[in-house]
A protein has these predicted regions:
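Extreme N-terminal leader/targeting segments of oxidoreductases
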Residues: 1-15, 33-38, 123, 139, ...
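Phosphate-coordination loops involved in phosphoryl transfer and adenosine-cofactor binding
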Residues: 12, 110, 185
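Conserved acidic residues
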Residues: 14, 144, 186
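General small-molecule cofactor/ligand-binding pocket signal
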Residues: 41, 106-110, 172-173
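Glycine-rich active-site loop/strand segments that organize a redox cofactor
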Residues: 45-96
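Glycine-rich dinucleotide-binding loop and its adjacent helix/turn
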Residues: 72, 76-80, 86, 90, ...
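Feature captures the FAD/FMN-dependent oxidoreductase FAD-binding
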Residues: 81-153
Length: 206
């Protein structure tokens, strides 16, 4: 009796990752290095990798742990310019990492995930994607493993402060800082005392 080989052939695993920030890059590197017979695609809404370090541009934006602890063990950087590296330097490190290990070919930029659901019958995920700026062109991709690596602070919103809607000046959130904003010579009020406000305040005073 000849046995069918089907049960002994490894099943190709399809993986979809949402987010090409520091976690998405780490996961991608682990998968292509350690797992055989896998296809993986990372989708990111931005035009480049880096996640929060590609988006945050507020004055003084930097990591709040020593730079040498904020890097990949498989791509150490001994040349950080300061103890707490600023956002631009961290982004350069992430981009150079993606280039060095040829990871960009697995990433599709300018694509937003609008939803996902589990297909119980076929035991697979349906992931819904949309090209940025094209709300009429939603596609669905199927995968066996669906990984969300978008971070926790991506969807910012302004606080609910009485009178904010009638304020005559400009209202800016640090997570949506305008590129090239000139704040010199202006009266600036900073609301909050977390990490971003502390970094921002110190730089605004310069």
């Amino acid at each position: 009796m000849e046995l069918t080989p089907t049960a002994f052939v490894p099943k190709p695993i399809r993986i979809v990752v949402i987010g090409a920030g520091i976690s998405g890059i780490q996961f991608l590197k682990d998968v292509i290095t350690r797992l055989p017979n896998v296809s993986i695609t990372v989708y990111d809404k931005n035009s480049q990798e880096g996640g929060t370090w590609a988006e945050n541009r507020y004055p003084g934006c930097a990591c709040d742990i020593p730079s040498h602890a904020y890097q990949y063990s498989w791509n150490p950087n001994p040349r950080w310019s300061r103890l707490y590296a600023e956002a631009a330097e961290i982004l350069d490190y992430l981009k150079s990492t993606v280039t060095k290990f040829d990871l960009r070919r697995y990433i599709q930029f300018g694509t937003t995930c609008t939803g996902a659901n589990w297909d119980e019958k076929n035991s697979e995920w349906n992931v819904f994607l949309q090209s940025n700026g094209n709300t009429n062109n939603e596609i669905s991709v199927k995968c066996d493993v669906f990984v969300v690596a978008v971070g926790r602070l991506n969807n910012w919103k302004l606080p609910d402060i009485d009178g904010l809607d009638t304020f005559q000046g400009r209202v800016i959130h640090t997570a949506n800082w305008p590129q090239g904003l000139d704040y010199h010579g202006k009266d600036v009020a900073v609301i909050g005392n977390g990490a971003s406000s502390t970094q921002c305040l110190a730089s605004l005073r310069k």
